[in-house]
Amino acid sequence: MGSLGAILKHPEDFYPLLKLKIAARHAEKQIPSEPHWAFCYSMLHKVSRSFGLVIQQLGPQLRDAVCIFYLVLRALDTVEDDTSISTEVKVPILMAFHRHIYDNDWHFSCGTKEYKVLMDEFHHVSNAFLDLGSGYKEAIEDITMRMGAGMAKFICKEVETIDDYDEYCHYVAGLVGLGLSKLFHASGAEDLATDSLSNSMGLFLQKTNIIRDYLEDINEIPKSRMFWPRQIWSKYVDKLEDLKYEENSAKAVQCLNDMVTDALVHAEDCLKYMSDLRGPAIFRFCAIPQIMAIGTLALCFNNTQVFRGVVKMRRGLTAKVIDQTKTMSDVYGAFFDFSCLLKSKVDNNDPNATKTLSRLEAIQKICKNSGALTTKRKSYIIENESGYNSTLIVILFIILAILYAYLSSNLPNSL
């Protein structure tokens, strides 16, 4: 759970954190007994605990398909991300990956930590993939083939223009959106969404990650990973790595705000995509990451810490998003709240201020017109009045900790 200091500062986070912890224990007990499926679900929880939690809400067949889709693409991404692999070796693997998933003898050692285990033991993923229905397999193969080819293209090509940036993000994330839409449709639960809306769902998430991960990517050893488009950063500095130096802070923040403004263009499509979903489990599966994305953009905007260290939503706020996101009204409320936070951080002297404000106002207009912004809803950005007595907070924390320990020890084994 979150640290004691964070919980004392935000006591309203404790109950969502408690529920999240119990849900995580519940999810871990849902791991199937078959060795290949046990490996896949265990690995899913290791590479993405939050994704592992949300996926558990899907129906059994769709859950299995999405689990394998995710692991196949994580494996593909591990090959792409490993800068120690030569281009001559990497490109053919990326191009042929869609065939490797049918071969339960294939594996390729690369990556680190849990990703190395995923690659070394990839036969488990292949065996699970072969268990899926034909509609699911065809969708996964198609997206893997297209993504591998796109990744291979950008191994040999730098991201120069905004069009290049959009194309790269399409290959590595927009195609994930298209693939998930195909899986939802194959399950019979949803109509097939348009490629344009599906693509925007992926691009909004990917661009957020690229913005947030600037420092990690630029410091990658043995070779930097550079995804910010030259068309944007060259307006502010001579080299992309110059953004991390303190003497360039003013220009770096302007460049950062330019990148965030570019990402915001996809928000309206994302709201449309989510509003068309019918199934509550699929809706939550899609909505939670999108709220996390706009929340992360709000934290990153105008924030020099992006160039100094890690910027991410506190764990308690993440737990609140997972706990409170049930309906489209919740999504409209969250997007409105975080767009308000973004708007409050816009400096009128910023060269992109007019464009940024225009995009934020378009998001806010959609949220207001939805009729979902009632006075009774819980806000993500307006903190509770700090009238808490510190002693009472500590007592409350102790009581809730005891309650959590009791609930944890008494969870039925069948959960």
UniProtKB/Swiss-Prot annotation:
Catalytic activity: 2 (2E,6E)-farnesyl diphosphate + NADH + H(+) = squalene + 2 diphosphate + NAD(+); 2 (2E,6E)-farnesyl diphosphate + NADPH + H(+) = squalene + 2 diphosphate + NADP(+)
Reported cofactor(s): Mg(2+); Mn(2+)
Membrane topology classification: Multi-pass membrane protein
EC numbers for this chain: 2.5.1.21
Gene3D superfamilies according to UniProt: Farnesyl Diphosphate Synthase
Disulfides per UniProt: none
GO cellular component: endoplasmic reticulum membrane
A single BP term in Gene Ontology: isoprenoid biosynthetic process
Inducing factors: Induced methyl jasmonate (MeJA) in adventitious roots.
GO molecular function terms attached to this record: squalene synthase [NAD(P)H] activity
Subcellular location: Endoplasmic reticulum membrane
Segments traversing the membrane: 281-301, 392-412
Listed PROSITE patterns: SQUALEN_PHYTOEN_SYN_1, SQUALEN_PHYTOEN_SYN_2
Pathway, per record: Terpene metabolism; lanosterol biosynthesis; lanosterol from farnesyl diphosphate: step 1/3
Superkingdom assignment: Eukaryota
Keywords: Endoplasmic reticulum, Isoprene biosynthesis, Membrane, Transferase, Transmembrane, Transmembrane helix
Main location: endoplasmic reticulum
Function: Component of the triterpene saponins (e.g. ginsenosides or panaxosides) and phytosterols biosynthetic pathways. Catalyzes the biosynthesis of squalene.
Family under the similarity heading: Belongs to the phytoene/squalene synthase family.
Stored NCBIfam families: squal_synth
PANTHER family according to UniProt: FARNESYL-DIPHOSPHATE FARNESYLTRANSFERASE, SQUALENE SYNTHASE
Name the UniProt record assigns to this protein: Squalene synthase 10
The organism of origin for this protein: Panax ginseng
Organism taxonomic ancestry: Eukaryota, Viridiplantae, Streptophyta, Embryophyta, Tracheophyta
Protein encoded by which gene: SS10
